[in-house]
Amino acid sequence: EIKISGHVPDPIWYITGKFEKDGSFFKANLISVIHNSSDTEKILSACKSQRGTIDNIVKFDKIISPPTPFNVSNLQKEAYRIFKMSPATTFSIAESLYLAALISYPRTSSQILPPSIGYKQILERLKMNYFQTNENIVNDILKREYLAPYQGKEEDPAHPAIYPTGIKQKKLNVLQRKILDLIIKRFLSTFGNNAVTKYSEVTINVNGYYFLAKANGILNKGWIHLYEPYFSINESNLPELKISEPIKVNEIKASEDYTRPPARYNQANLLDKMESEGIGTKSTRAAIINLLIKRKYIFQDKNGIEPTELGFTIFNTMKKFVSEIISTKLTSSLESSIKKIQEGDLEIGDLRVYLEKALSNPINEFKLNESTIGNEIKNVLTSFENKMSIGKCPKCQKGEMILIRSSKTKKRFLACSQYRVTGCNAMAAVPQKGLIKKDSTCHCGWPILHIMFARKRWWTTCVNRICSNNRYNIAHHYDSESNALI
């Protein structure tokens, strides 16, 4: 987030050419990115009304191996990619499927399915209970003389990778059906053959400037047809071309853009980052993210995960006084040591000695500055909880609509900051739960809020109770003292 806020966008230009061969059109991009408008104009002028020449052609077949069986981390990341489902929700659903005997134990780090689980028996049950109308999908696998799923590298001595039991499903909700279907199709795809694609790359010389066109086509779907619709390849084609062959340039155009800051994390790639930094385990990482959201240290919207003011303050305060405690190196070292203890490679006593040595100075520093640290966090926590600017007051146009928590009722509501100055009595009720963020201004002049609840998606509402965009303008009661929803 610090890198994002410090990013200064620089203008860049992309140049694209539209080429033609025997009535077939395709696009190619200038290989280099241009950083000033004068060079852009120079290239456009140099390429205008010119013919291109095929400078180089690269073709090769690309083999795509089947996916590995799911461990809990892979399942969480895949469910987020496909369904935008949070890791915590995915894990909770997987546990419910396990308790219903529909899948194996989900809290596993293994990517290996041992023969002892009974490949054939599971496939037979899946065919009978889930593929009655399309038995050929499973029959093609069962016809093989030797059944062997594609295995991953990660092992868990306690549990195999996640797999479906094949038992007939009972009454499931929509999310449970989605996760179960994903697990079933992932299991089937591990028995699939390699997929094969044909990759083509053509370099075109236009008056000394080089454009690159790419194409990708499927030669053999292999395991992909077993995993559909959860994986697909965008196919594109190029006409038949030869090196040194002239080619018609139909159009050359430039588009201006700006350099972008690093993308914010989402819950899936944050899991990857935590894994690479050695923070948490496959079973605890989703819970850690969920806890940070619950405590309002971070929040997630459609743009990704962002730290709140409270989260930033805690980070900066701890970094200032006890940076060792928030070091990922210390956390990673501790997680590694715990794993060694589980595997019998380290004694608990040795870990205790290490921790006493590593944490001695940080703990002393913390105790020495405990009062200062507490006051800094307390101040921002009070500000964060009791006051948040939402936008201009629609009534007086002078004050700010701020989020206030009533000291008497403990309920929160919006009120004009000019109340004590001018007596402006503009107020609006807000939901008593959920993370609130301003979205935009409604046609009625009042703010539209973006609100996220635990395990629910974001939704929006105008805070003006008589506006048609207010989700609560019908059949809800308001507290007369605070004007808050009851």
Predicted features along the sequence, with ranges:
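Basic, low-complexity terminal or inter-domain segments flanking catalytic cores
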Residues: I4-G6, P87-A88, S109-I486
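Conserved phosphate-chemistry cores used by DNA topoisomerases
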Residues: E1-E95, A100-L102, T259, S276
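Short Lys/Arg-enriched helix C-cap and helix-to-coil transition segments
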Residues: P106
